Amino acid sequence: MKKTAKTDTEDAFKFRSTFGEHYYDGYGARHETPHIVAYTGEVTAAGPGRVLISSPLGSCIAVCAYDPGTRVGGLAHVMLPGVPPAHAETGKDRYAAHALETLFSVMQNEGADPGNLLICLIGGANVLRREHDTIHIDNLRSLTSLILQRNLPICRTMTGGSERMMARMETKTGRIFQTTGNNPEEMLFDYFTHNIENPDN
């Protein structure tokens, strides 16, 4: 099965997958499904049978996009709002606008319909607890505006606060999970049933 993880510091797509290995979720359950990690400023997409995971999120936000029709999922680990500087040659996917363009492009390459995508957002915390630090707020505003401009629904968000977060998406089941701080992993959203496990969060 084809897997794509892209960073714009390289000309070609960069593959970040681990075959036959395992990881443990917040409940200590062992998972054998190969997974792909999106680190800061990276974008990844894959079809059914893969698990997409963000590295820890502070003020960064994980954009988790999914096409239920093809079971193609994508994850962008966004670091900064807006567009990259005009002179930037690398690191463009750290910025919200460029990261979304890359995300939708690589998902389409995997067979997704760009008009059929459902979105969840995770992260955007003020982990340093600085009173005048607004980067986490700016990231959320930038991404929300750009996504709504494309008339794509934002189904669920888990943003804000002061604790690090992580995102995990199962492309086969259409479920997205989030971890906050040292707490156990929780299901945030089911892209097929639209069920929310923790509606009061």
Curated annotation (Swiss-Prot):
It comes from the Bacteria. It is an enzyme of class 3 (hydrolase). The keyword S-adenosyl-L-methionine does not apply. Coiled coil: none annotated. The keyword ATP-binding does not apply. InterPro entries: CheD-like_sf, Chemorcpt_Glu_NH3ase_CheD, Cytotoxic_necrot_fac-like_cat. Belongs to the CheD family. Probably deamidates glutamine residues to glutamate on methyl-accepting chemotaxis receptors (MCPs), playing an important role in chemotaxis. This is Probable chemoreceptor glutamine deamidase CheD. It comes from Chlorobium luteolum (strain DSM 273 / BCRC 81028 / 2530) (Pelodictyon luteolum).
